[in-house]
């Protein structure tokens, strides 16, 4: 076999990254290491016995198939435990986290296993103060959801459990969820209310697995009175996240604790959702929120203006409500733009004044790979041929990595397709480039702002070219 152990595992990781879901890869595969290759027997080390058992049970055949394909010969795969590798790798960040974490916080990046004064940190409700029942406008589109949320807030764990709120983007699901939390905390300040997005739940789970601190993770999520989980549709296809959430759900439900979930669709329309989870999500009440009608949209604008101290003529309210029909977020955004424009320009508030700046909302335009190449070349002063070529000069190499990162995040191209765009580079090279840019983005605020600026330029370019 004419391939080194490191190269074999690096190429295998690239294939597994493409085949498996991102949380699965991050939690189980990325933390493993190729330990040795002797007599066609590949030993893969894992950071804990838990991880070794899970890989052996669920991914042994997949990993074996991939490494054999990369090596070109039959291989036997074995799994071992080598926790010291992970401890050494994570030690610097763990030390920083232990000294800098504030009481009352639970960041996704902080080690779950660390304790403060002998116990896990208090969880902050993380609720938006504006999302209260008093600021929620009730209409025919959301009356049932509002009534159900009030019932749950008044008698958590007894009215509807779980309460599943579903509807499109910007229709008030998050507002109602957090209003439940505010209501309960006002009635009982000692209540343990926890609002979390599904992405945060998944990230915390991955972090716990990597640090072998699942017990702390479970205590954190299961020792609550009300659990509010937003965007639960993003649990689709995440097998281990679904497994863990299933047991979290059962523990809370059996203890009479309230669970409120929100998604952009009903449970049975979420693809690759375990049947048992779909059944549990549906066992309480599913309350759908529809787009608001014209009267409700006008009422929303009036209430928003009232809270913000704005004075709006009736015809302006009607114009905005007629122009923006799909969701509340766009509606309120249009109102803010109109008020800001009038304030800055000094013009009177009228339909004629705001009409030019409130064009009807349009679908976001597509960002193409060629646009990304153009913007990156201009930003870094390199030519297209060099960027797409194989030059190893530092400035060109960095610009190329940024272009790959932008393609991954702003187009639908797969890693292999991005590699093809850059002269047939292997998808592992693309993955490495994207991870390197992500790391620099986290560590360097100026670099993060540069990436944000590039993304904004791409959106402007896409809108101008696709008109």
From Swiss-Prot:
Predominant location: cytoplasm
MF (Gene Ontology): ATP binding; ATP hydrolysis activity; DNA replication origin binding; lipid binding
Any one annotated GO CC term: plasma membrane
Entry's localization field: Cytoplasm
UniProt keyword list: ATP-binding, Cytoplasm, DNA replication, DNA-binding, Lipid-binding, Nucleotide-binding
Short name of any one Pfam family annotated for the protein: DnaA_N
Superkingdom in the source lineage: Bacteria
InterPro entries with a match to the protein in the record: AAA+_ATPase, Chromosome_initiator_DnaA, Chromosome_initiator_DnaA-like, Chromosome_initiator_DnaA_CS, DnaA_C, DnaA_dom, DnaA_N_dom, DnaA_N_sf
KW Electron transport (keyword) present: no
Binding positions for ATP per the UniProt entry: 170, 172-174
CDD domains in the cross-refs: AAA, Bac_DnaA_C
Stretch list, region Domain II: 85-125
Chain residue ranges for the region called Domain I, interacts with DnaA modulators: 1-85
Region Domain IV, binds dsDNA: start-end pairs: 343-467
Signal sequence coordinates: none
Start and end residues of each stretch annotated as Domain III, AAA+ region: 126-342
An example Gene Ontology biological process: regulation of DNA replication
PROSITE patterns the record matches: DNAA
Family membership: Belongs to the DnaA family.
Quaternary data: Oligomerizes as a right-handed, spiral filament on DNA at oriC.
Free-text domain note: Domain I is involved in oligomerization and binding regulators, domain II is flexibile and of varying length in different bacteria, domain III forms the AAA+ region, while domain IV binds dsDNA.
Protein function: Plays an essential role in the initiation and regulation of chromosomal replication. ATP-DnaA binds to the origin of replication (oriC) to initiate formation of the DNA replication initiation complex once per cell cycle. Binds the DnaA box (a 9 base pair repeat at the origin) and separates the double-stranded (ds)DNA. Forms a right-handed helical filament on oriC DNA; dsDNA binds to the exterior of the filament while single-stranded (ss)DNA is stabiized in the filament's interior.
Name used for this protein in its record: Chromosomal replication initiator protein DnaA
Species in which this protein is naturally found: Synechococcus sp. (strain JA-3-3Ab) (Cyanobacteria bacterium Yellowstone A-Prime)
Taxonomic lineage from the root: Bacteria, Bacillati, Cyanobacteriota, Cyanophyceae, Synechococcales
């Amino acid at each position: 076999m004419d391939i080194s152990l490191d190269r074999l595992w690096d190429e295998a990781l690239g294939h597994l990254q493409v085949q498996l879901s991102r949380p699965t890869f991050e939690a189980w595969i990325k933390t493993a290491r190729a330990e040795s290759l002797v007599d066609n027997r590949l030993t893969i080390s894992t950071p804990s016995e838990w991880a070794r058992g899970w890989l052996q049970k669920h991914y042994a055949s997949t990993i074996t198939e991939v490494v054999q394909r990369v090596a070109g010969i039959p291989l036997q795969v074995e799994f071992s435990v080598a926790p010291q590798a992970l401890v050494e790798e994570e030690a610097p960040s763990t030390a920083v986290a232990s000294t800098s974490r504030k009481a009352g916080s639970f960041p996704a990046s902080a080690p779950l296993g660390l304790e403060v004064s002998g116990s896990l940190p208090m969880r902050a409700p993380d609720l938006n103060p504006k999302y209260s029942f008093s600021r929620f406008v009730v209409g025919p589109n959301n009356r049932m959801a509002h009534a159900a949320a009030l019932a749950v807030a008044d008698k958590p764990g007894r009215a509807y459990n779980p309460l599943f709120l579903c509807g499109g983007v910007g229709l008030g699901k998050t507002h109602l969820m957090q209003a439940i939390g505010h209501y309960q905390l006002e009635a009982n300040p000692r209540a343990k209310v926890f609002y979390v997005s599904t992405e945060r739940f998944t990230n915390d789970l991955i972090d716990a697995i990597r640090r072998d601190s699942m017990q702390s993770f479970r205590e954190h999520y299961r020792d609550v009175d009300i659990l509010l989980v937003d965007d639960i549709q993003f649990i689709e296809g995440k097998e281990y996240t679904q497994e863990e959430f299933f047991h979290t759900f059962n523990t809370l439900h059996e203890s009479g604790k309230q669970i409120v979930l929100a998604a952009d669709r009903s449970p049975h329309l979420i693809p690759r959702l375990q049947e048992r989870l779909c059944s549990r999500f549906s066992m309480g009440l599913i309350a759908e929120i529809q787009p608001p009608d014209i009267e409700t949209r006008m009422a929303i604008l009036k209430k928003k203006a009232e809270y913000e101290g704005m004075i709006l003529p009736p015809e302006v309210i009607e114009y905005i409500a007629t122009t923006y029909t799909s969701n509340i977020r766009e509606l309120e955004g249009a109102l803010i733009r109109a008020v800001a424009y009038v304030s800055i320009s000094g013009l009177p508030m009228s339909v004629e004044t705001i009409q030019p700046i409130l064009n009807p909302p349009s679908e976001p335009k597509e960002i193409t790979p060629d646009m990304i190449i153009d913007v990156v070349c201009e930003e870094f002063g390199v030519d297209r041929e060099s960027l797409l070529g194989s030059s190893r000069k530092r400035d060109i190499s960095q610009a190329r990595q940024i272009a790959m990162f932008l393609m991954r995040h702003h187009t639908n191209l797969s890693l292999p397709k991005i590699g093809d765009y850059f002269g047939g580079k292997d998808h592992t090279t693309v993955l490495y480039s994207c991870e390197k840019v992500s790391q620099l983005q986290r560590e360097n605020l100026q670099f993060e702002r540069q990436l944000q600026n590039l993304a904004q330029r791409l959106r402007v370019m896409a809108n101008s070219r696709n008109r």
